[in-house]
Swiss-Prot record:
Residues 1-15 form the signal peptide. Keywords: Calcium, Complement pathway, Disulfide bond, EGF-like domain, Glycoprotein, Hydrolase, Hydroxylation, Immunity, Innate immunity, Metal-binding, Protease, Repeat, Secreted, Serine protease, Signal, Sushi. Ca(2+) 3 binds at residues 226, 236, 275, 278-279. Ca(2+) 1 binds at residues 60, 68, 113. Predominantly expressed in liver. Residues 438-680 form the Peptidase S1 domain. It comes from the Eukaryota. It is found in: Secreted; Cell surface. The modification (3R)-3-hydroxyasparagine is found at residue 149. This is Complement C1s-1 subcomponent. Cleaved and activated by C1R. Immunoglobulin-binding promotes autoactivation of C1R, which results in the cleavage of the Arg-Ile bond in the catalytic domain. Inhibited by C1 inhibitor (SERPING1). It comes from Mus musculus (Mouse). Residues 131-172 form the EGF-like domain. Residues 16-130, 175-290 form the CUB domain.
Amino acid sequence: MWCLVLFSLLASFSAEPTMHGEILSPNYPQAYPNDVVKSWDIEVPEGFGIHLYFTHVDIEPSESCAYDSVQIISGGIEEGRLCGQKTSKSPNSPIIEEFQFPYNKLQVVFTSDFSNEERFTGFAAYYTAIDINECTDFTDVPCSHFCNNFIGGYFCSCPPEYFLHDDMRNCGVNCSGDVFTALIGEISSPNYPNPYPENSRCEYQIQLQEGFQVVVTMQREDFDVEPADSEGNCPDSLTFASKNQQFGPYCGNGFPGPLTIRTQSNTLGIVFQTDLMGQKKGWKLRYHGDPISCAKKITANSTWEPDKAKYVFKDVVKITCVDGFEVVEGHVSSTSYYSTCQSDGQWSNSGLKCQPVYCGIPDPIANGKVEEPENSVFGTVVHYTCEEPYYYMEHEEGGEYRCAANGRWVNDQLGIELPRCIPACGVPTEPFQVHQRIFGGQPAKIENFPWQVFFNHPRASGALINEYWVLTAAHVLEKISDPLMYVGTMSVRTTLLENAQRLYSKRVFIHPSWKKEDDPNTRTNFDNDIALVQLKDPVKMGPKVSPICLPGTSSEYNVSPGDMGLISGWGSTEKKVFVINLRGAKVPVTSLETCKQVKEENPTVRPEDYVFTDNMICAGEKGVDSCHGDSGGAFAFQVPNVTVPKFYVAGLVSWGKRCGTYGVYTKVKNYVDWILKTMQENSGPRKD
């Protein structure tokens, strides 16, 4: 292996005699290397002279061509030396310099020194044996660019950056493969504004980042392409093709298409096709990248922020639903969402819509119902009703609910709180037809006294005052905290009680001023004989079960002698035995003095020891009275000043000296504050 470092390269070229040839400087048409000496020995057949001519000379200029040069030597004599940048003396001829020699041998020597400050491409020369000139002696030019004559023929050649097609006559240009990625630029046909090459296909690509569309702008005067033929076909044409559409082909003098082409694509292909003829200057265009725009799509029932006339790539908007509408994604809902203008001109989240808020199925309520709506969306109105006549709406305007913007059912008065159906008090299903009193009274239906509570142990009565509370006498519960109670039954026969509604006590509250005694049989003080039983579960009201009203605190609820009230129960009769079926009677109020005058039946108690207070009511008449087993039952009076008769509990059966005469009743009006306070302080969460 030879390893040489050469600062000067000497090369020579010689061959058998030929009729023609080509001589090119090293690396032509690229820049020639430094420090080179290369020679060519030209020889044509005997009898021919040599015609040597240069078509390209671009050699470092110097005085007398002392640095770089190409020498023409004939017979040892220098016939010429060339350097510098030379051009053709005639625009119609590619020949820059030419030499003719009568002899058939010639030497060409190219020399370059050790350095060049600029880029020089060297030279291109051709030689022929002198004979006829096919390139000039005929009318038709055989070559599209350069014609080179030789004895017996010719050959065609092309200028730099061109190539010779397979037909060996026409030159084309290598103008494909350029890719433009800058957001702004300019593209023109080859040689513009000089004539473009014939028989060529130039392909260019504009590729911008996603989110930008290619916008092409043309000036009519910057377009000069061979016009269409009589049938409208373009022999030479310029065509644009984006992803989804094509623009063109275009040809003619002056651009015939729109001067601004918006492609709606970030890529654009440009094809310039020419045929074998033509001498037009071509075209020049400018392009830039314009952010892709997204159309403002009006989403129903929403607002856009910011609100602009035009939205472009990467713009973000907040879409907020108007009141009563929401966006639902899976199981998550919200009142707004964000959308971004994407690179394809479409909005992200375009599938989201503002739809009416869904409130769901209205919650049920105890002792009432709600109409089933056709739908449960914003603006829908539903109505709650109670199971009349046994329940009524606690708030008169509390039945109408509207599906609100927050997705909740809302009432103008109660807000989101559900309406409450409370028992209607004091209205018996069947009014009691009075004939006589309990003691020797008359049979009654439970529908006459639906508030009647039967205490089986101890045997007594009570009054249902709402769904969770029973009012009775304190002495009934003095020795027991878990009474056995029933409602809704006329008969207290053991077998029939199984079908009655049993009440379970949660807690017993005896009035704090009630005085306990060890022996109830000797009690003489029944002051504050009142108690409350709180129930574990609410009582279901109906035709046989409903509460009695509490008295008001006004003077209208004061009872006076002569006023008639109703009593009921399962106490003993004139025969001294407990009854099985409910009995009722109507009794008048008398003065307390009347009760004081009753003869005592119990010999162990002195009559003067009995205590009479303003907390007591005396009522009854001979043969008409409550008795043992009726204790705690209601002494009912009609509520004053009402259109539909209803009853309130004015008194509770408390005590008496002798059955069948006059009895003493606890005056409930004096205890209303205690009753309400006790119920309020001990009411837990409602089971609505």
